[in-house]
Amino acid sequence: TVFYLFNFKFMADKMFLPVEHKVMAAVAQDTGDAADLVIAVERNGEARAYPIELIGYHHQVLDTIGGEAVMITYCTVCRTGRAFSPVVNGAPETFRLVGMDHFNAMFQDNRTGSWWRQVNGECVAGPLKGTLLAEVPCSQMTRGAFTRFHQQGLVMQPDPAFTKEYEGLKDYDEGTMVSSLEGRDTASWQAKSWVVGTMHKGLSRAYDWNYLMRTGSIIDTLAGDSILISVNGVDFDSRR
């Protein structure tokens, strides 16, 4: 008898496993580093924060915030954090990581096998091609900033089952980890340089992170509207 296990170890959903024990702590009890970056989501008066060095490994976390189901996602290769409603055609859906396309994480829904881009929630292959997941507004800020803005908020804690995996992303926030995929080009406008992306009325534009950090703000016009991009250099809290 011959068994073939080719590529099993390198399948995305085997390399990056879902959370087993999701624990949320009140900000008063949270002992994490105030400088850690988080993705923050607020729904119906309830705010929750998800440290990037945790969800960066899992790539997605399903949660309920303010009575709403939310799928919080993060791609460590392109540094994109997005949140979506995991409801497809009126029914709750679950997803698994299947790989990446154009350096962005790709998910597959469990009901139809369709493939969805993490960067914008667009289905690009399968029976649901062309469908978009409903976006849930989210913000990136430090743990400390979240605590100041949301004193009744909750913060996701490390899952003890993945301590070793989280350790591999310990330098990710600062952009100092050595990796061809997750590493950072510190110069501007290189393949792995940091940018702030803005989408408005169907138009998209990217702004150089280094320039924004030097100036603190950028004023521009997009789709005929004036926009202001500003950053808090202490908390890495960007506002658009």
Please place each PLM-identified region on the residue numbering.
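Mid-to-C-terminal functional-domain signal that highlights helix-capping/loop sites
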Residues: 1-240
